[in-house]
């Protein structure tokens, strides 16, 4: 792991950009933390509006640090400047054609769109965790927040270092991931925008039902994809405060 830049922001946040092999990421920590800080992994959206420096992501990170946590994100395949697997480009084209024609989105399209991303992104997150948890100012427990929902589902199913998660229901989910969700037993707080045109609501409900967690909350709000009310974020903060502090 190598830190390649460092700056102190005006709200008491230390921002450090790092590389781990081919992985690029950013770590945000409280500038004056006296003890190791619990860590929250921030997932990203796929596509050109994602990336390490997207305004929404940076705002989430700074808000997370203001709540007393460390926050980190990595540039996963298909976000920002990092190219995704070629098969996902074709799947994205097939998805767009199906939606424009009013046809159902098949399981094959969803698998080709999501599974290749998981095969790269999940090992990248595990390598990032390996490196960050060696730092003296970072400690457990570890939470996951947001992004393409299938990524934290698989990560939580296979990596016991993830102890709680806030999930954003708003992306397509392969059937194999719904099955894998039965292995996820950590506390979960799931946000669902009820009127999100790009979200298969029933798929989101099926995924929530499949989770094996004894503590899981579905927080549904009226409105579209970008209409998440501020109080929903406040509820998510309280969730992490209960489970990570």
Please state what every model-predicted region is.
Residues 1-35:
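N-terminal cap/lid segment of alpha/beta-hydrolase-fold proteins
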Residues 119-183:
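Primarily recognizes the serine-hydrolase "nucleophile elbow" in alpha/beta-hydrolase
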């Amino acid at each position: 792991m190598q830190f390649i830049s460092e700056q102190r922001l005006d709200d008491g946040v230390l921002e450090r950009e790092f590389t781990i092999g081919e992985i690029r990421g950013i770590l945000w920590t409280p500038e004056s933390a006296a003890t190791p800080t619990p860590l929250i992994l921030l997932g990203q959206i796929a596509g050109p509006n994602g990336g390490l420096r997207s305004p929404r992501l940076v705002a989430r990170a700074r808000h997370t640090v203001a709540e007393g946590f460390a926050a980190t994100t990595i540039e996963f395949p298909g976000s920002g400047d990092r190219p995704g697997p070629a098969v996902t480009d074709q799947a994205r084209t097939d998805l767009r054609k199906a939606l424009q024609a009013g046809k159902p989105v098949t399981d094959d399209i969803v698998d080709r769109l999501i599974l290749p991303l998981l095969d790269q992104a999940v090992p990248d997150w595990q390598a990032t965790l390996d490196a960050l948890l060696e730092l003296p100012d970072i400690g457990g427990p570890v939470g996951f927040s947001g992004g393409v929902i299938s990524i934290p589902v698989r990560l939580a199913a296979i990596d016991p270092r993830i102890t709680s998660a806030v999930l954003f229901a708003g992306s397509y989910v392969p059937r194999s991931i719904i099955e894998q969700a039965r292995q996820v037993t950590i506390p979960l707080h799931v946000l669902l925008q009820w009127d999100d045109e790009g979200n298969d609501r029933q798929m989101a409900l099926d995924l929530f039902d499949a989770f094996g967690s004894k503590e899981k909350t579905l927080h549904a709000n009226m409105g579209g994809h970008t209409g998440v009310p501020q109080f929903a974020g406040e509820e998510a903060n309280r969730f992490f405060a209960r489970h990570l502090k």
